[in-house]
């Protein structure tokens, strides 16, 4: 069944520590049974090894869902037919919320494929039940009382439905755009892997029993114990030798990779004009196929010159990285700093500045927890999206003044760069909240003071009126 999905402020699914996004596809709607869900009419699908995440485009906080891949019993794909979009039909098995361990009778919560949380024994034992007529009673028609074969869905005599299919156990993924075949192959691969794991957990008792028997036959007496200890030491020595050999091979491979990257960069610099764009795209496609470049889930998103899906996912990824850097309400980074921080977190397959700026233009239109502001000089700043953000920045600047401050002291106290500090002080000065004065002793430094001239002028005006 489908469960409620918790999303991040950047409208990305909250992943488990061992999860990573394998595939992304937008313009997808959901069907529960054969009925179209109007609350889940358009969204983005994210596939991992454990879940299928649906993040709604209209209201991601309320309408986002997730499906466990271990709950999927069957996967079917239907292609486009006239005006009907291609769909992936997910038949879900009924998973009990709790199950009792047959060894220690501990009540576990979750999928029965997981081992018991108390004794650690997998749920691979079945209790043999006596034969009865319960199987054949399942095919009894309630309309004409005809005894049908248990696996039939409809009565052979009157055509009455024998089995009630729960609409929550059949979910259809409707792909309004492309990508249904690729997504189906990925889901099918993950479900097959889950079935293999389920089969191995169920039938690995023979292998375990054989290993215990072989170990017990080898061990016997003090001489065998000493021999076993010597064999273990020799095995550990061989393991260390192979490890250092692999480490040397890794370092040599790293040098070759760096030289290959230098040749790659020289070839890029040698191309010009339209030839550069075509050749660059070919080389990037080849390098991605060979696994030379490695990044986050953006590498699984189709990219093109006008790919809005890629820009949206890049915008979400940028906000995720910046939110780890912006802790307080007054923290601020520039566009250049944000670009450097994000590419440093990727480590490879870096984002060019033009693509980064194009994705950042979507930040204010998307609810990702980050907002931008443009200063008078054209400098673009990133900060956390909070209520009355400009008032909080002004209060922070005024608190630094005791009773005056310099740009350097203000930058150190608020953890801003000197450029951002000068922009903020200039903006506050233009708004009339602070004033500047040349520091006479040093001759070059500027002191910023709170603007108390307005209050003084009001008091003087009031005094003259009274007199």
Curated annotation (Swiss-Prot):
Subcellular location as annotated: Cytoplasm; Golgi apparatus
GO molecular function terms listed in the Swiss-Prot or TrEMBL record: phosphatidylinositol-3-phosphate binding; ubiquitin binding; zinc ion binding
SUPFAM superfamilies per the UniProt record, alphabetical: PH domain-like, Winged helix' DNA-binding domain
Gene Ontology CC terms: cytoplasm; ESCRT II complex; Golgi apparatus; late endosome membrane
Gene3D superfamilies from the UniProt entry: Pleckstrin-homology domain (PH domain)/Phosphotyrosine-binding domain (PTB), Winged helix-like DNA-binding domain superfamily/Winged helix DNA-binding domain
InterPro entries referenced in this protein's UniProt entry, alphabetically: GLUE_dom (IPR021648), PH-like_dom_sf (IPR011993), Snf8/Vps36 (IPR040608), Vps36 (IPR037855), WH-like_DNA-bd_sf (IPR036388), WH_DNA-bd_sf (IPR036390), Znf_RanBP2 (IPR001876)
Sequence ranges assigned to domain GLUE C-terminal in this UniProt record: 170-203
Domain GLUE N-terminal, residue spans: 5-94
Zn-finger segments (RanBP2-type): 97-122, 137-161
Record carries keyword RNA-binding: no
Keywords on record: Cytoplasm, Golgi apparatus, Metal-binding, Protein transport, Repeat, Transport, Zinc, Zinc-finger
Any GO BP: protein transport to vacuole involved in ubiquitin-dependent protein catabolic process via the multivesicular body sorting pathway
Domain of life: Eukaryota
Domain remark in the UniProt entry: The second RanBP2-type zinc-finger is functional and binds ubiquitin.
Family label: Belongs to the VPS36 family.
Matches recorded under PANTHER family: VACUOLAR PROTEIN-SORTING-ASSOCIATED PROTEIN 36 (PTHR13128:SF12)
Subunit text: Component of the endosomal sorting required for transport complex II (ESCRT-II). Binds ubiquitin.
Functional summary from the UniProt entry: Component of the ESCRT-II complex, which is required for multivesicular body (MVB) formation and sorting of endosomal cargo proteins into MVBs. The MVB pathway mediates delivery of transmembrane proteins into the lumen of the lysosome for degradation. The ESCRT-II complex is probably involved in the recruitment of the ESCRT-III complex. Its ability to bind ubiquitin plays a central role in endosomal sorting of ubiquitinated cargo proteins by the ESCRT complexes. Required for vacuolar sorting of carboxypeptidase S (CPS).
The protein's name: Vacuolar protein-sorting-associated protein 36
Native source organism of the sequence: Schizosaccharomyces pombe (strain 972 / ATCC 24843)
Protein encoded by which gene: vps36
